Structures are given as structure tokens and as C-alpha cells.
Design a protein with these regions (language model features):
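Active-site-adjacent substrate-recognition loops and nearby beta-strands
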Residues: 90-100, 117-159, 174-183, 253-272, ...
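Flexible, small-residue-rich helix->loop connector segments that border functional cores
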Residues: 8, 12-30, 67-76, 293-299, ...
Length: 367
């Protein structure tokens, strides 16, 4: 999987730092460990249609970076607060990925706290959900593709035990008829009146979740309105979800015409144990419209808390300062609060075996 940078939804540079502009972080005496991730490899970018100018990282490199941070904390014998300010809309959003499982485990180890940004997908129009019942076994929705987005992917997830097939209608009116689920097969479809090719994996049993995944990759996508028709094979009550890529992997000109702003928390923010942080405007008290929303498809309550995430002052390169907005900034603010709690618990020997789960519940109780 690939993950885009989600450190802030809005960032503004405001000039050089002067004496009157000095400011302090939440935990100014904390020591920082920063890991510069290697960009995603070219073959991964090609498969997923991600251009070279987009900040994007492989999950394996993120895991390696976290492992390095853990080794430094163990060598220094100090408590650790891990802040993850990036995410991905790939996956079933259930928190069952290898990355999520590992973070769940780390949260049970004493003296390790983890906070994750919820994502900034609340108002991007990149999630659609539909339902089936015995009287209504089809659902049709529209995808608007912008001029700038030639290569991208779409994931449709169907909860077990229901099975679905899918049809596509291009902006020129050409139809790709019923594509039934298979175990391991990728089909390629082309069109006469537009140059688009689409590659479809309709996987009946996705290996991490056991649910049905329809992975659609567009190559040289024709701009306009694409119509997608999903039909349930089984006459039972069930629900499906469709997600487009998150962050700046695609432009804001590509979106669903009837989106659902809920269930937009990016992975690993949908993990059970890490503290998932949304963002609110601390000046007005309102939730940021871009802040991703819960719950997860299995009704796990996420995000856990919201934190200040509007125009937070921050230092930047070249002795300058700026402001950042979004759930990444809110997660960083929360990481400072967790560091202060770690100081009270571990350094001052009030609760030496405190875990990430203990910290999460403490913050939820006092929020």
C-alpha cells in the first residue's frame, strides 16, 4: 500500500522568525526523533497511477522508520510518543491491515503512546456508500473524473457474506457489462470512443479481511461522468463502500456526485488501539469541515478525540515560521499533550507501566 503525506490540510508561510514571534511547543523540553522516509518506488507509482511530484511513501518504509524510532527509545531507556501524520484511503477501513495490527500491539506495551491523524477527507467527496435489501438489489452512482487525473484507482468493498457484480458506463455511453467476482483474476477493458483502459480485479476473498474487493485502475481516464452500477448477487441486507485515493494523489476535480462524508478516516487512523485525532477550530469551537469522520464500517467509534487544528503556529525551514491546519497538525498538538502525560507517569514515577491504551482512555475521559 502507498500513503500520502497528511501533515496538514492548509499550510501557510508567514516570514522569518523575529524576537517578538518566538513561541513554545506543547512539550518544549521533549527530545525529537524525526525519520525522513524514502519516496515510493517508481514501479509502485506506476501501478497506482501516482506522479513523481506527489509525496507518497510505501507502508514497508513507514514500518522500518517506526522500528528505528523504537530502537532509539529502547537504547535510551525513555518513554516514547509516536505521532503518525499520514494516511491512506486504501483498504476496507476496518483496521485489519498489517500496519494497524502492529500499532494495536504497540499500544499494549508500557511507556509507548501512539496518536494518528484522522485524515482530511471529510469534504473531498471521495467516499460513497450504498445498501441492498431483498426488494432493491442494485445501486447506481456517478464518478466525476477531472482533466488532470488520467491514472488513478478506485476501491469498492462489499461486506461478507453478500457478493456483488459491477458494471461501468463511460462518458461516451459505452458499457462494460457485468463483472462477476473471481478468486485471482485481473481483466482489462478498453473503449472505442475514448482512449481509456480500465483494469478490474473483482476479488471474492481479500486476504486481510475476507471481504470482497473490487479494485479498479484507470489508465488514460476520459474526463466526464462515469456511471457505476453495483448489483447484489444474494438477496440479503448488506452495505458496500467505495473510496477514491486520499490526499493529493488525485485532484479535487475527481469526486463522487453523491458522496458520503462519513467513514472517511484514513488508515491507520481506523485502528482500534492508537489514539485517532480529528481537528476543530479552536477559535470558533466548530469541527473543521475537512476533518475525516467516523465511524468505521464495523461501527468502531473513531476518531477518539478532536484537538486544536486551525492555523497552529509552527517553525519551518530557513528560520521562518508559518501556520498549519488539519488533522496532522492536531495530532502533533496531541502528541505534545501525551508527552506531558508520559512525564507525569514515567519520569515522575506515578504510573511506571502506563500503556498507549491507558493514555487514550485518560484523554477521552477528560475531553
Amino acid at each position: 500500500r502507498v500513503r500520502s503525506s497528511a501533515a496538514s490540510d492548509v499550510y501557510k508561510r508567514q516570514g522569518s522568525i523575529k524576537e517578538e514571534h518566538y513561541f513554545s511547543g506543547v512539550a518544549p523540553r521533549a527530545e525529537l526523533i524525526m525519520v525522513k522516509l524514502a519516496p515510493a518506488k517508481k514501479y509502485n507509482r506506476k501501478i497506482w497511477g501516482i506522479t513523481e511530484d506527489v509525496d507518497c511513501y510505501q507502508e514497508t518504509n513507514i514500518l522500518l522508520g517506526i522500528e528505528y524510532i523504537l530502537s532509539v527509545a529502547a537504547r535510551l531507556n525513555r518513554p516514547l510518543v509516536l505521532c503518525i501524520g499520514m494516511g491512506s484511503s486504501q483498504g476496507a477501513h476496518e483496521g485489519h491491515s498489517m500496519f494497524a495490527t502492529w500499532l494495536n500491539y504497540l499500544c499494549t506495551i508500557p511507556r509507548i503512546g501512539i496518536c494518528v491523524s484522522a485524515g482530511n477527507e471529510g469534504n473531498k467527496g471521495r467516499h460513497y456508500s450504498g445498501t441492498f435489501n431483498p426488494e432493491r438489489n442494485t445501486d447506481t452512482f456517478e464518478l466525476r473524473v477531472g482533466e488532470a487525473d488520467k491514472n488513478f484507482f478506485l476501491e469498492i468493498w462489499q461486506n461478507a457474506p453478500c457478493r456483488v457484480m459491477v458494471e461501468f458506463t463511460s462518458p461516451t455511453g459505452e458499457i462494460v457489462y457485468s463483472i462477476f467476482p473471481r478468486f485471482d483474476e485481473c481483466r482489462e477493458y478498453s473503449f472505442i470512443f475514448c482512449p481509456t483502459r480500465i483494469f478490474i480485479n473483482n476479488i471474492i476473498l481479500e486476504e486481510e479481511t475476507g471481504e470482497q474487493l473490487i479494485l479498479v485502475r484507470f489508465e488514460d481516464a476520459f474526463s466526464g461522468i462515469w456511471t457505476i452500477r453495483v448489483t447484489a448477487i444474494d438477496d440479503i441486507f448488506c452495505e458496500f463502500n467505495a473510496w477514491l485515493p486520499s490526499g493529493n494523489i488525485i485532484s479535487e476535480e475527481t469526486y463522487f456526485l453523491r458522496p458520503n462524508p462519513y467513514t472517511t478516516i484514513t488508515s491507520p487512523g481506523n485502528s482500534r488501539n492508537p489514539l485517532t485525532v480529528g481537528a476543530y477550530n479552536q477559535l470558533s469551537g466548530s469541527i473543521l469541515i475537512s476533518s475525516s469522520r467516523g465511524y468505521t464500517p464495523s461501527n468502531l467509534v473513531k476518531p477518539d478525540i478532536v484537538a486544536p487544528g486551525y492555523a497552529l503556529p509552527c517553525p519551518v525551514r530557513n528560520q521562518a515560521f508559518g501556520v498549519a491546519s488539519g488533522t496532522g497538525a492536531a495530532a502533533a498538538h496531541t502528541a505534545g499533550i501525551i508527552a506531558l502525560l508520559m512525564e507525569w507517569a514515567v519520569e515522575k514515577r506515578n504510573y511506571m507501566t502506563i500503556t498507549g491504551r491507558d493514555i487514550n482512555l485518560s484523554l477521552i475521559h477528560i475531553s
